[in-house]
């Protein structure tokens, strides 16, 4: 249910940026307060990303107030913080649909709005894209401003610094707004720094600086002295030397919750040439006390009552696959002091909190640095450690060369615990784990496993750990099947499947379902309805070729079932094996199509793409009638 904007009178006057820019500046504080209240009341009704948006309310208002969006380009890194942007760009009354099937996209999404200038979802891409847009604007002679907003966490990634280095080198007009919401760069925020920021963007300082540079351009020793003097003045009170060294004019830090200070500073910066960096300090969860106190807990929230000042207790359910991994990691580390676990800034999401506390000397959070995480794991493995890299499927895409070049070619014993494989649901196309089967199975030396329940997951993790070669265990987001894992850990026979159900009728008139991964319950449900054989393949690579040939020879048709893309996936592996052995058999491959999967619940997406029991039954009937 959408909120009534009549209860937010100032926000009702600023539902699009052009209307926002008609407001007098003294109304912006009031607008920011209403926008924050609207965000709180909206997300609490729908669920979604929360704390980041609360922290960027004033910054969002100021950016749309100063810049002529959408002509001026505004890019949000990752996009968790972009809910206020969506509200101010004509989508307030659709916020009740965010992250739902056929609803608003969870992140900035160009097909949804002209104000969403670049599709995002992963970290640290905005500066590169903004620089490309700045060059394009110059080539086309458009007097367009380009602004990238990036958080201090995303700024730790190598890609961000690659872009900063390039931007500082070619000196194109662009603004990078560093949203520092963890105080990780500087705690030196207050009246002095806000005053200094305004001073450094003011006409007086910049006319002196630019004029002085021109005046002294032919006197190198004096020019160098002047530059050092300016650097020394700024360096005494500004933590921006690194950005200056990269070729940016650094401004800040300023209070990101003082909307008028942000407006004044941005307005001054509009007239600057070359790359500029504005450092704003914000509070994640600003305006909602419990979110300020625990921004990680309130980063993404379920539906809740704001008056309770707490999130609802989750209903008892089966442990998540992330929790199964976390428990295995603790159990294994207790036995193996050489186990070293690596995560690229996903400790909570990957289920590693307890492990990090119990085994701090065996735990490494390398920040948002997927490429480094994989090669760091390779280095650990090369010199005798048993490396475990815990990473989301969609984030492993960012380290594909390292996976091949640094791990697989050297056949190093690195275990990849791949969370969020397959359909993840509400986060949409940037986060679906659709491609890992296809991009892993083509790599020599890799062993790829797909568990169908919690116990299978635990045993596969143990198998990969003991294998002493590159291995991957891919498992889905969310709760498991309710299977209690065996406490004992047993290595599985590599490349061997298990038969879960045999048809009771003549096999030559029936279908065999070859299941890869978490869709096994759907396969079994369908098999009961149509009396089919079900084989849980377990291994995507090496494939249980004997089981495939036996099923093909005994049954009238095969169905392959996976939660990844069909092209190059596990079904493709089955077809390749049949072809190599000269077997001609009717095969229906069920998986994800050649398109990006939008947001919606996992169950909605399974149903839409024919991966639930109903879809499997329909596929079987299309084969055997």
UniProtKB/Swiss-Prot annotation:
Q: Name one GO cellular component term.
A: cytosol
> Which UniProt keywords are listed?
Isoprene biosynthesis, Magnesium, Metal-binding, Thiamine biosynthesis, Thiamine pyrophosphate, Transferase
Q: Where does the source fall among the domains of life? A: Bacteria
Q: Which Gene3D superfamilies match?
A: 3.40.50.920, 3.40.50.970
GO term, biological process aspect, one? 1-deoxy-D-xylulose 5-phosphate biosynthetic process
**What positions does the entry give for thiamine diphosphate binding?**
80, 121-123, 153-154, 181, 288, 370
Q: In which pathway does it act?
A: Metabolic intermediate biosynthesis; 1-deoxy-D-xylulose 5-phosphate biosynthesis; 1-deoxy-D-xylulose 5-phosphate from D-glyceraldehyde 3-phosphate and pyruvate: step 1/1
| InterPro entries with a match to the protein in the record | Dxylulose-5-P_synthase, THDP-binding, Transketo_C/PFOR_II, Transketolase-like_Pyr-bd, Transketolase_BS, Transketolase_C, Transketolase_CS
Which EC number applies?
A: 2.2.1.7
Residues binding Mg(2+): 152, 181
Task: Tell me what reaction this enzyme catalyses.
Answer: D-glyceraldehyde 3-phosphate + pyruvate + H(+) = 1-deoxy-D-xylulose 5-phosphate + CO2
Q: Which cofactor does it need?
A: Mg(2+); thiamine diphosphate
Q: Name the enzyme's class.
A: transferase
What is annotated about its quaternary structure and interactions?
Answer: Homodimer.
Cited function: Catalyzes the acyloin condensation reaction between C atoms 2 and 3 of pyruvate and glyceraldehyde 3-phosphate to yield 1-deoxy-D-xylulose-5-phosphate (DXP).
Tell me the protein's name: 1-deoxy-D-xylulose-5-phosphate synthase
């Amino acid at each position: 249910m959408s909120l009534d904007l009549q209860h937010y009178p100032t926000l009702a006057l600023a539902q699009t940026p052009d209307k926002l820019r008609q407001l007098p500046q003294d109304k912006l504080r009031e607008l920011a307060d209403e926008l924050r209240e609207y965000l709180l009341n909206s997300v609490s009704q729908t669920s979604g990303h929360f704390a980041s948006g609360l922290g960027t309310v004033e910054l969002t208002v100021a950016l749309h107030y100063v810049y002529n969006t959408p002509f001026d380009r505004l890019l949000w890194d990752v996009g968790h913080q972009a809910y206020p942007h969506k509200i101010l760009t004509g989508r307030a009354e659709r916020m009740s649909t965010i992250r739902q099937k056929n609803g608003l996209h969870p992140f900035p999404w160009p097909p949804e709005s002209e104000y969403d200038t670049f599709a995002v979802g992963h970290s640290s891409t905005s500066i590169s894209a903004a620089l490309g847009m700045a060059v394009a604007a110059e080539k086309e002679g458009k007097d367009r401003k380009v602004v990238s907003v990036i958080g201090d966490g995303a700024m730790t990634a190598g890609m961000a610094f690659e872009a900063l280095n390039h931007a500082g080198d070619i000196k194109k007009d662009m603004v990078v707004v560093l949203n520092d919401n963890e105080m990780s760069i500087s705690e030196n925020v207050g009246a002095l720094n806000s005053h200094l920021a305004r001073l450094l963007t003011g006409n007086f300082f910049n006319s002196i600086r630019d004029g002085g540079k021109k005046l002294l351009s032919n006197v190198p020793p004096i020019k160098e002295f002047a530059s050092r003097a300016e650097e020394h003045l700024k360096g005494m009170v500004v933590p921006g030397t690194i950005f200056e060294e990269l070729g940016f004019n650094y401004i800040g830090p300023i209070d990101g919750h003082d909307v008028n200070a942000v407006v004044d500073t941005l307005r001054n910066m509009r007239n600057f040439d070359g790359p500029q960096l504005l450092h704003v300090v914000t509070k994640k969860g600003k305006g909602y006390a419990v979110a300020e106190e625990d921004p990680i807990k309130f980063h993404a929230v379920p539906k809740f009552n704001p008056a309770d000042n707490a999130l609802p207790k989750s209903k008892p359910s089966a442990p998540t696959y992330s929790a199964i991994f976390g428990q295995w990691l603790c159990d294994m580390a207790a036995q193996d002091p050489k186990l070293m676990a690596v995560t690229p800034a996903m400790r909570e999401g990957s289920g590693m909190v307890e492990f990090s506390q119990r085994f701090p000397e065996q735990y490494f959070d390398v920040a948002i640095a997927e490429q480094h995480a994989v090669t760091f794991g390779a280095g650990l493995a090369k010199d005798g450690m048993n490396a475990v890299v815990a990473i989301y499927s969609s984030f492993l895409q960012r380290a594909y060369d390292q996976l091949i070049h640094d791990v697989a070619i050297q056949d190093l014993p690195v275990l990849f615990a791949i969370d969020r494989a397959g359909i993840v649901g509400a986060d949409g196309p940037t986060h679906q784990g659709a491609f890992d089967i296809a991009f892993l199975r083509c790599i020599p030396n890799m062993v790829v496993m797909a568990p169908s329940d919690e116990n299978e997951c635990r045993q596969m993790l143990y198998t990969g750990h003991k294998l002493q070669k590159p291995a991957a265990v891919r498992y889905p987001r969310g709760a498991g099947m309710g299977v209690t894992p065996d406490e004992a850990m047993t290595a599985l026979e590599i490349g061997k499947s298990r038969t879960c159900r045999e048809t009771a009728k003549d096999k030559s008139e029936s279908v065999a379902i070859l299941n890869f991964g978490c869709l096994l319950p759907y396969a079994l449900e369908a098999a009961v309805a149509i009396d089919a054989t079900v084989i849980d393949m377990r291994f995507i690579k090496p494939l249980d070729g004997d089981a495939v040939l036996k099923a093909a020879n005994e049954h009238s048709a095969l169905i392959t079932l996976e939660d990844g893309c069909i092209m190059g996936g596990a079904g493709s592996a089955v077809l390749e094996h049949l072809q190599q052995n000269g077997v001609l058999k009717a095969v229906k491959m069920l998986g994800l199509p050649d398109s990006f999967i939008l947001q919606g619940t996992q169950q909605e997406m399974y149903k839409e793409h024919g991966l639930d029991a109903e879809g499997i039954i329909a596929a079987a009937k299309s084969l055997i009638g």
